[in-house]
Regions:
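ATP-binding N-lobe of GHMP and related small-molecule kinases
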Residues: 2-111, 123-135, 164-165
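Alpha-helical scaffold segments in soluble metabolic enzymes
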Residues: 86, 120, 124, 141, ...
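Short, conserved phosphate/pyrophosphate- and ester-handling motifs at nucleotide-, phospho-/glycolipid
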Residues: 114
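Alpha/beta catalytic cores of group-transfer enzymes, especially the acyltransferase/condensing modules
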Residues: 133-166
Length: 166
């Protein structure tokens, strides 16, 4: 008999990457809090895919990550991928977990790939908890991870573009 699943065993998200046309830099908190800001950007048909799944407790490690490198670790603090580590710290999902990414474009392409990753991973973690969240909430959480937790000198357009698309 089929059962409804409120907490899935696996989730895959697809997050768009973006092009910025104007206003880059006006989305930095230090700027827009004093002067306001406006950006013109659009997402493109190039995506970052994030899969989060529960892996078997038969594996020796608690967290398995596969992106341009592979990590097998037992604690959050051991995770080298800082965005993944802090997203997991913010939205706790009981391990053991496997996180894999694939992208249509290479990292450091200048098209917001780290923010697309943060947005996709946060959506997936919420889904693993059975939570349906808004694009605005995920965009703000991704900004919190990258700007507040990781202290990256970046603005907010990438996270919002990826979360809302368009």
């Amino acid at each position: 008999m089929p059962q409804s699943v409120t907490r899935p065993r696996a989730v895959t998200t697809v997050s768009p990457q973006r092009l910025s046309f104007a206003g880059g830099g006006t989305d930095f908190p230090d700027f827009y809090q004093r002067h306001g800001g406006a950006v013109i950007s659009a997402t493109i048909n190039k995506y970052l895919y994030v899969t989060v799944k529960r892996h078997s407790p038969l594996f020796n490690e608690t967290y398995r990550l596969s992106y341009f490198k592979t990590e097998h670790v037992n604690t959050l603090d051991e995770i080298e991928n800082d965005v993944a580590r802090e997203c997991l710290r913010l939205i706790h999902v009981d391990p053991p977990l496997f996180i894999a990414t694939a992208a249509d474009l290479p990292a450091s392409s200048g098209l917001g790939s780290s923010s697309s990753f943060a947005v996709g991973l946060l959506y997936a973690l919420h889904a693993m908890r059975g939570e349906n969240v808004s694009a605005g909430q995920v965009a703000e959480e991704a900004c919190h991870v990258e700007i507040d937790m990781l202290k990256r000198p970046i603005g907010k357009q990438d996270q919002y573009a990826s979360a809302f698309g368009g």
